[in-house]
């Protein structure tokens, strides 16, 4: 997905929150690519976040997703616009891209992972974690595991298999 490379490269020179990042229509009018609404929102969350599509054309289910995505944007605003940004993968990683936001006070963090390619029989994805306070405790909202920042920073997290790109 081109947008991932754009945001990755731009983040070396500008604050990630200043990058224009919007959920576009699907299929995309420039690339013809079809990407799930949830993935497009995850990528846009690592930027200015917005929608560049005709909301009237969305299904009721998609409108409910948009409402939840906007709520998440507000819930994570302090992280994505005021927190520290970490690139967790290199640009040449062809299977997935991951990044992290950590609050300035280190009380919470947001890790996002986006699968770039679909392959048969995919392996679980392991992601390094950075920037957490060693002596603080953090709970993973994905699986409920509670660990110290030191443990998360050294061990990272292994995610379940991705089944779709």
Regions found by a protein language model. Give the residues of each.
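C-terminal beta-sandwich/jelly-roll accessory domains of carbohydrate-active enzymes
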Residues: 117-165
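A broadly tuned preference for mixed-charge, low-complexity surface segments
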Residues: 23-37, 97-101, 151-165
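Carbohydrate-binding surface patches
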Residues: 91-133
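Catalytic cores of secreted or luminal carbohydrate-active enzymes
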Residues: 38-89
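Solvent-exposed, flexible loop/coil residues
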Residues: 23, 27, 41, 55, ...
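Glycan-recognition surfaces
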Residues: 1-56
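Flexible loop/turn segments at secondary-structure boundaries
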Residues: 29-31, 52-54, 60-61, 95, ...
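Conserved, mostly hydrophobic/aromatic
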Residues: 44, 111, 140
């Amino acid at each position: 997905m081109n947008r991932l490379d754009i945001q990755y490269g731009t983040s070396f020179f500008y604050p990630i929150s200043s990058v224009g990042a919007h959920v576009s229509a699907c299929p995309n009018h420039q690339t013809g690519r079809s990407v799930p609404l949830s993935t497009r929102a995850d990528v846009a969350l690592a930027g200015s976040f917005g929608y560049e599509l005709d909301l009237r054309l969305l299904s009721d289910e998609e409108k409910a997703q948009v409402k939840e995505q906007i709520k998440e944007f507000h819930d994570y605003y302090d992280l994505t616009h005021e927190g520290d940004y970490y690139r967790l993968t290199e640009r040449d990683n062809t299977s997935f891209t991951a990044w992290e936001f950590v609050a300035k006070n280190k009380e919470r963090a947001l890790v996002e992972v986006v699968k770039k390619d679909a392959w048969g029989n995919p392996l679980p994805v392991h992601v390094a974690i950075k920037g957490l306070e060693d002596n603080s405790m953090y709970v993973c909202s994905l699986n409920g595991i509670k660990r110290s920042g030191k443990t998360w920073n050294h061990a990272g997290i292994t995610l379940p298999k991705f089944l779709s790109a």
